[in-house]
Amino acid sequence: MFEADYARTELAVTTPGTDMVCQRGWYSSTDFWSPELFDMYVVPQLRKLTALAHKHRRKFAYVMTTGVEMLGPRLADAGVDVLYFVDPVLDKLSCRKAAELFGDRMTIVGGLNSNTLVEYNNQKIRDEVREAMDVLGPTNRFILHPVDSLFPDVPWESVACMIDAWKDYQ
């Protein structure tokens, strides 16, 4: 399996216009791996992938939604530049804790659970955007993003509210 990941990464980093390679680690979380097994089997392969990306002056991103508090520092140590998706609800990882752990080591994508948008409570959406921006914004390594995506049941008004709250923060 690693050979396929390496070949895919190599193709991506040698393709003109590629800025970043993203490895989806949906099955590389503490839901499936103990920290010891993660260190033994995932980290060494990940180091090779990040080294390949960096050799070609590309960024390397990794997707992980649970177990981030425990495994995230290992991702940073392995050379990951961007961590998708820091989820304050699903993973119970507050923006403050994420900033402490990774704020100076990796760009963090997330900070807002998409379920917040389903409820369409303007004040709650604005409060959560402000919290994420207050805490993670100063790191200059933060991309506000509803984790893990916008689903069909999310009212557009909620998305507009999130965007407006972000704009108001600027």
Positions of PLM-derived features:
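Active-site loop segments of alpha/beta catalytic cores
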Residues: 1-170
